[in-house]
């Protein structure tokens, strides 16, 4: 009977020592590095950015169409190359780190709203409303480009 108690006591002591060692171990020496962009992400972002900038060249054509009140051409540009540009912007946003996504995502939504305002100007046959939407779109697009993180 005495022998059984010693075994129980030794088991309890070993359990307490193990618990103390595990509890006082602290954080591991190898903490993960801060999140950064992988080479694949950088390549994807640069590819999307190149396509975005290429399609953005059509802003000048949109401005002319709006000024003329050529609503069919304006809509074709917004739904064609500038619509593709919006899709590329959304794809680029998904490739950004979570901390870098909020501003570009909000500006992409704002740009979509600006295009809707141009479309509303076309529905109303109002060059003034459409031009206001165009100016807002141009400003939001420039802000979008400036909001993207520097990639090295």
UniProtKB/Swiss-Prot annotation:
GO cellular component entries: extrinsic component of membrane; photosystem II oxygen evolving complex; plasma membrane-derived thylakoid membrane
GO annotation terms (biological process): photosynthesis
Membrane topology: Lipid-anchor
Role of this protein: One of the extrinsic, lumenal subunits of photosystem II (PSII), which stabilize and protect the oxygen-evolving complex. PSII is a light-driven water plastoquinone oxidoreductase, using light energy to abstract electrons from H(2)O, generating a proton gradient subsequently used for ATP formation. Plays a role in the stability of the oxygen-evolving center on the luminal side of PSII.
Coiled coil location: none
Protein name: CyanoQ
One MF annotation (Gene Ontology) recorded for this entry: calcium ion binding
Range of residues in the leader sequence: 1-23
Predominant location: membrane
Residues where lipid is bound covalently (N-palmitoyl cysteine): 24
Summary of subunit composition and partner proteins: PSII is composed of 1 copy each of membrane proteins PsbA, PsbB, PsbC, PsbD, PsbE, PsbF, PsbH, PsbI, PsbJ, PsbK, PsbL, PsbM, PsbT, PsbX, PsbY, PsbZ, Psb30/Ycf12, peripheral proteins PsbO, CyanoQ (PsbQ), PsbU, PsbV and a large number of cofactors. It forms dimeric complexes. Purifies with PSII, present at about 0.4 CyanoQ/PSII monomer; is not usually seen in crystal structures of the whole complex in this organism.
Covalently lipidated residues, kind S-diacylglycerol cysteine: 24
Gene3D superfamilies per UniProt: Oxygen-evolving enhancer protein 3 (PsbQ), four-helix up-down bundle
Stated family: Belongs to the PsbQ family. CyanoQ subfamily.
Species whose genome carries this gene: Thermosynechococcus vestitus (strain NIES-2133 / IAM M-273 / BP-1)
Presence of keyword Nuclease: no
Keywords, ordered alphabetically: Lipoprotein, Membrane, Palmitate, Photosynthesis, Photosystem II, Signal, Thylakoid
Subcellular location, record wording: Cellular thylakoid membrane
Any matching Pfam family: PsbQ
């Amino acid at each position: 009977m005495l022998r059984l108690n010693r075994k129980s006591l030794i088991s309890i002591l070993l359990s307490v020592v193990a618990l103390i060692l595990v509890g006082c171990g602290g954080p591991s020496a190898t903490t993960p590095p801060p999140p950064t962009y992988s080479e694949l992400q950088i390549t994807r972002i640069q590819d999307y950015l190149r396509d975005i900038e290429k399609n953005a060249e059509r802003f000048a054509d949109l401005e002319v169409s709006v000024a003329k009140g050529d609503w069919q051409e304006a809509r074709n540009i917004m739904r064609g190359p500038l619509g593709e540009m919006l899709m590329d912007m959304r794809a680029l946003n998904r490739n950004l780190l979570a901390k870098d996504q909020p501003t570009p995502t909000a500006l992409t939504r704002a740009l979509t709203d600006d295009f809707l305002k141009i479309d509303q100007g076309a529905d109303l046959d109002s060059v003034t409303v459409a031009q206001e939407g165009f100016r807002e779109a141009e400003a939001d697009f420039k802000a979008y480009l400036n909001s993207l993180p520097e990639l090295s």
